[in-house]
Amino acid sequence: MGGGCALSIAYKTVGKPSKDDFIVISVNHNCPQLGPFTHSFPMPENLPECEACTCAWTWVPDERSSADEMYMNTFNCKVTGGKKGKIQGGKKPIYFGVEGGVKGGKGGRPKYKTKFKNGAQKLKVQWLTTL
C-alpha cells in the first residue's frame, strides 16, 4: 500500500479553497497500512492559528498496489495555541493521476515517502503584529 500520507492546510476563509491553497504540514512515511488507522502526524511548532481552516489528508499509493490515482479527504479544522501569521511558500500536496497534477517520471510516481521528510514539515511564517 505504502507511498506515505500527508496532512495539509488551507488558510483561505472566504470561498472554497483550491488545490493551490493547501500547504503540507506533516507527513507519515509509513501510512497507510492494513488494519485500523492509527497513524500520527506531528505538527510544526510554528503552525499559525486559525479559527476556520480546511485541512486535507492525501495519499499517493505505491505503484505495486494501485492504478495511477491519489486519494484526498478534506475536513474543517481549527488551530489553537499559536500566533497569528501567514505561511510563506511551503510545499504543495502531491496531486497525481488527476487533471493538472504531476506525472510519474523515470523514478516512478511521486510519493510522500520519497519527496518529503517524515514528520512535521519546516514552515516559514510571516507573523502578524497587532498595534
Where are these regions (language model features)?
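Internal, hydrophobic beta-strand segments that form the core of beta-sheet-rich folds
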Residues: 51-63, 74
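Peripheral, solvent-exposed domain-edge segments
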Residues: 1-6, 10-40, 65-131
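Short, well-ordered loop/turn elements at secondary-structure boundaries
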Residues: 2-3, 49-51
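Short strand->helix junction
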Residues: 46, 63-64
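Short, hydrophobic beta-strand segments
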Residues: 39-47
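Surface-exposed coil/turn segments at beta-strand junctions on protein surfaces, enriched
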Residues: 32-34, 46-50
